[in-house]
Amino acid sequence: MPRTTPLEHYRNIGIMAHIDAGKTTTTERILYYTGKSHKIGEVHDGAATMDWMEQEQERGITITSAATTCFWMRHGQSHEKGTGAEYRINIIDTPGHVDFTVEVERSLRVLDGAVTLLDSVAGVEPQTETVWRQADRYRVPRMIFSNKMDRVGANFDRCLAMIRDRLSKRAFPLQLPVGSGETFTGHIDVLERKQYIFHDETMGKTFSVVDVPEEFKDACEIARHEAIEAAVEHDETLMEKYLAGEELSMEEIRRAIRQATIAMEFIPVFCGASFKNKGVQALLDAVIDYLPAPIDVPAIKGHLPHHDETFIEAPIKDDAPFAALAFKIATDPFVGKLTFFRVYSGVMASGSYVYNSTKDKRERVGRLLQMHANKREEIEEVRAGDIAAAIGLKDTRTGDTLCTEDNPIILEAMKFPNPVIDVAIEPKTKADQDKLAIALQKLAEEDPTFRVRSDAETGQTIIAGMGELHLEIIVDRMMREFKVDANVGRPQVAYRETIKKRVEKIEGKFVRQSGGKGQYGHVVINMEPSEQGQGYVFEDKVVGGVIPREYIGPVEQGIKEALETGVLAGYPVVDIKVQLVYGSYHDVDSSEMAFKIAGSMAFKEAAKQASPCLLEPVMKVEVVSPEAYMGDVLGDLSSRRGKIGGMTQRGEAQVISATVPLAEMFGYSTKLRSMSQGRAVYSMEFSHYEEVPKSKAEEIISKVKA
């Protein structure tokens, strides 16, 4: 089947922002204007197409990243697909709540460009900065849409100043708002020198284009000059022409801005009010004009299986070998497990076999689906640049590479943060126990930041996630979708243990010899702290065959399993480096199990001698409060072991930045509400792990042991 849309007409984009900036509302307008939906779904009614989970509709927030495909023809004319002139836009609407940061992370990994939304009243908020940094890490070109210009207090100039201060100095407005709050009617296109006025009676589908009013002419010319000057810096021919005073054509200007945006040297800024249907079509035009097609970004790199140092590329072509990355797993009530993936090269037909190079397994693709939020359309094949979902991939997980056995490649996987909060969960009946195990396994498959473990001492099932809301939604889904009835404990901080000094020649010896075949395993290890975030590093330094090769793996595994339960308070141990340096074996009695136990014994002894300490998650907290309550807010943060990082003015309010241990933040929202009569708000996100002060650590350890 030939390609219906040329690759240069593809746009794979994400919509990302802080919670409540209007991402889902903007996506709903895009679906409406591109003809994907015939009526607009509103978030506050619980009817948004992209928020299809019950939990999303009840809470009015986006939890999972819904994917959809639509078609757009530049200059405000949307067309049915198939005419060849339209552009295919694959959109992923991502959550803005910090607890669901994994959804943003995995979406950015497979996108070519992104639109960052701001609330024009609040400007750049903490989670805006977080998603911006995530996009920087994946080098995703992006543009900014300053939304909610219709709200009282909207201030485009202040937003622009905050963008340049906190996100990028290379941000340039290509539109200026006409009015703000109740008086907002549309925008000025600074490149075309025209004013766009949107008609309310057609829900913004029609608009008038008039000359720029006199009072906006100076601002328009300044913005135009700044934008063109910044864009032509990357094109010598245009630079010379511009400096010589020659007028550049609109096509030349757009091409220069496009090149600079794709090179991440230019951030175009637009404005509008999605809820009032103003500015969304112009934003779609800008996506076409300035964000990259798959062929505009460098080909993705990977390595050969079992050869991490041998790098290869997956060229963005239909006639290249097939290569795709699975970026999301979802459980669908009707078809079971859905695997969302992005195709980087080649073609794959439904019903064909693919090779999962990450797992070294061959799998059959049952059906291929084009997703529209939670609705689906069956398709026969996928090609380079497509984002689609497959049914039937049993062993594939988030971050796995799908390719052909003849041309294997492993694409760079995604890195996910560790959970910071734990909850104990107990099934109410025996029937619930079986259902609980299945539910937790499926939910953990979907979400790499959700972990399940069993407490070695109590036998309780412990679930861990990125925050209280994250775990609340997991438990809610477990009860609704999997019909599990369970008792849920209070959220607990996910403490960790580590060591502070190096220890050498620590012995672990496991011997059972009492007639018949016995057990014999003997190891000697060195152990030292490694850098934060390094996890567990194991090095085999054995020489002379004192431990046979087949027993090295079991030693490593024994230590790895022992890491689950630290020596201080039974918390998982992180960031250590172990060197296996010596040992001995017995021709008859040695076994894998004996060496596994010996490894575990050596680790426990080494941990006791290596100055073990307790670590706690520390959160980055931002509080926005009216001046009148600042004293109380600051005093309260200090009483929570908070460290104040700085204070800035935002409109009439003060913004306090601080780092506070997560253990001290439970119940903070209630306290802040009562301190400020409901006028202060806060947001928090994980920052780092830090050693717990001695007195506090003793308190935690004695509580656990009691």
Curated annotation (Swiss-Prot):
Gene3D superfamilies: 3.30.230.10, 3.30.70.240, Elongation Factor G (Translational Gtpase), domain 3, P-loop containing nucleotide triphosphate hydrolases, Translation factors. Keywords: Cytoplasm, Elongation factor, GTP-binding, Nucleotide-binding, Protein biosynthesis. GTP binds at residues 17-24, 93-97, 147-150. Residues 8-295 form the tr-type G domain. It comes from the Bacteria. Belongs to the TRAFAC class translation factor GTPase superfamily. Classic translation factor GTPase family. EF-G/EF-2 subfamily. This is Elongation factor G. It comes from Gemmatimonas aurantiaca (strain DSM 14586 / JCM 11422 / NBRC 100505 / T-27).
